[in-house]
Each structure stands twice: as C-alpha cells, then as structure tokens.
Regions:
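Glycine-/small-residue-enriched transmembrane alpha-helix faces in small-molecule transporters
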Residues: 1-43, 91, 95, 155-180, ...
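Hydrophobic alpha-helical transmembrane segments of multi-pass integral membrane proteins
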Residues: 8-13, 39-58, 136-141, 159-163, ...
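Specific transmembrane alpha-helical segments of multi-pass solute transporters/efflux pumps
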Residues: 24, 56-112, 146-148, 237-256
Length: 323
C-alpha cells in the first residue's frame, strides 16, 4: 500500500499525462499524414526509448533509481513487463491508426478509444480487481460526457469503427498490464523497454506498407523526411507524448486503481479540445462544454471514498427524520 500523499501525486502525474497527450494530438496528426502512420509510430517509439536511456543513467546517479533490478528474477520481471507493455502499445496504436485511415471520424475515434474507461473495470473483474460503487457511477457519467464531447449526435457504426473499438480493448489490456508490473519494477526502465519493443516490432509493417519493400519505394519514403514539419511532429511526439507521457503513465499508475487511472487519462479528450480553443482559437459548443463538465464531475465522484458518501447519506436521512 502506498500513502495517500503518494496517491495524490500519482493522480496528478496521470492528469499531466493526459494534458501532454491532449496537446500532442495536432503533432501526431500532422506527423502521421507526412510520413505514414506506421512509420510515425515506429520512429517516435524508438526516439522515446533513446531519450530515456540518459534519463535512467541520471536518475541512478542522483539516487532515484529505487527499483534497479539486482537479481536475475527481477531483471526477468522487468524485461517481461516492458515487452508485454510494448506489444500492447504497438497493437493498440496500430489498430487506432488503421481505424482512422479506414474512415472513422476523429471525434468518433476519440470517443471509441476512450471507451477503455468502461472496459478496464469490466476486464478487471476477471482479475479480481473490484471497484466501488462511486467508481462505477463515475465511469457511466464519464462515458456520457465523452459522448457529448466527441460525438456530433450520429450513432451510425461502420466497419472502421470496429477497428477503433478494438484499439480501446487493447489499450485496456495495456493499462491492466501496467497495473500488474508497475509495483514490481522501476517504471522508467520498463517504459524504455516498452518503447524499444514497440519500435522494433513496428519496423516490419513499416517496411511493407509505408516503404513499399522496394528500392524506389524506400527512396521515395526517405524524401518525406526532408520536410521540417514532419520532424518537428515526430520529435515532439517521440520526446513528449511517448517519452514523457507514457513514462508518467507507468509511474503514475503505481498504487492507483486501474479504473480510476483510466478515467484520469481520459481527460486527454478534454485537454485536446481545450488546446484547440487556446492554440487554434477554436470555440467550445454548449454540447462540448457539457461533456467537459461531466467528465470532470465523474473523476471527482470516482475519487470520493465510499465511506464518506455513506456517512453523508446517513446524516441526510437523520436530518429528514428530525423534520
């Protein structure tokens, strides 16, 4: 068990993670359009892994590497956790990009992807991870809020949406895998292994689908990187969204109920909309504003201790009886 102050710190780390992911949405979109989705995911992951190598050395030198593996079993657990996280991350991000490429609208893609906040507690039941009533109530409210925020009122379902929904399933697995391994190993080290795994696994599909597996195809693919905007997007996504964001996720999830963690990270949708307002001078509609308010309310409700709510209910009943 970790202390309450540590839980608050880790919750704030997950909110910061959502903020980084939300703001990085524009960079990810531009980078994927410039060099191809598979290339973008592969390169950003490898960059993130490289960036974390000196970070690990620095943390060890400063004495913050508290879970540096000593025994062979600890190293095995670290490598296993990193590889499992990397495979789940690769499959989830690839499924999401394929769904968007097949035609899922960005708003619907955001909603379907964020449905992992509903899937995590459901899958967690099979792993004997119980959730209190407040958490379930918060999940339902958050899903409604996400619908208002991301959807335009259409409820049609296309084939591409199935791929995006698969992405939500895979991200649920990713969150639960992190929940299992994060208390056992050093989060930064596991994140580093995760990114190298994701990047290396992504090389083959990148070569087949983006490069065209021919000399001329590779030459044409290389010319895409002459665009400075492409590199800016890749570097930002690699360093911030991946290197910083996913590492904060692994560190922040330690000791946090995975369902609550998924709800905190679903703030990515809210921050992406707010970033559009601040950076791109867009405007929030009434529908989007209601969605943001519902998501924030859901997160607050999910954090309330069940005992506190019961006590409040008892006090209310006593007050009514006195009247």
């Amino acid at each position: 068990m970790i202390s309450r102050s540590m839980k608050i710190r880790n919750s704030l780390l997950l909110v910061l993670t959502a903020l980084i992911w939300g703001v990085a949405f524009v960079a990810q979109s531009k980078g994927g359009d410039a060099v191809g989705a598979l290339s973008f995911n592969c390169i950003r992951s490898i960059i993130a892994g490289i960036v974390l190598l000196p970070v690990i050395k620095l943390l060890d030198a400063l004495g913050y590497g508290s879970k540096k593996p000593a025994a062979s079993q600890e190293k095995k657990t670290l490598v296993t956790g990193g590889i499992c996280c990397g495979l789940a991350l690769f499959l989830a991000s690839t499924a999401q990009q394929i769904g968007i490429t097949m035609g899922t609208e960005p708003g619907k893609a955001g909603f379907l992807t964020a449905c992992y906040i509903l899937l995590v507690p459901v899958f967690g039941l099979f792993l004997k991870k119980k959730c209190g009533f407040n958490i379930w109530r918060g999940v339902v409210i958050a899903v409604v809020g996400l619908y208002f925020l991301c959807m335009n009122g259409s409820i049609s379902f296309e084939t591409s949406d199935l791929m995006t929904l698969l992405c939500a399933v895979l991200f649920s697995f990713h969150i639960l895998i992190i929940d299992h391994f994060s208390p056992l190993v050093d989060g930064v080290r596991m994140s580093c292994i995760q990114f190298f795994t994701c990047g290396i696994v992504g090389i083959i599909p990148m070569f087949i689908f983006d490069m065209g597996h021919s000399i001329s195809g590779i030459s044409e693919w290389l010319t895409l990187f002459a665009d400075a905007d492409a590199w800016i997007a890749i570097l930002y996504a690699g360093v911030m969204s991946s290197g910083v964001g996913y590492t904060l996720q692994i560190v922040g999830q330690n000791g946090i109920n995975p369902t609550v963690a998924s709800m905190l990270m679903s703030l990515e949708s809210v921050f992406s909309v707010l970033a559009g307002v601040v950076i791109l001078k867009q405007f929030l509609t009434v529908r989007e504003t209601v969605g943001c308010v519902l998501i924030f309310a859901a997160i607050i409700i999910a954090q309330l201790p069940a005992g506190k709510v019961k006590a409040e209910n008892v006090n209310e009943e006593q007050g009514q009886a006195d009247l």
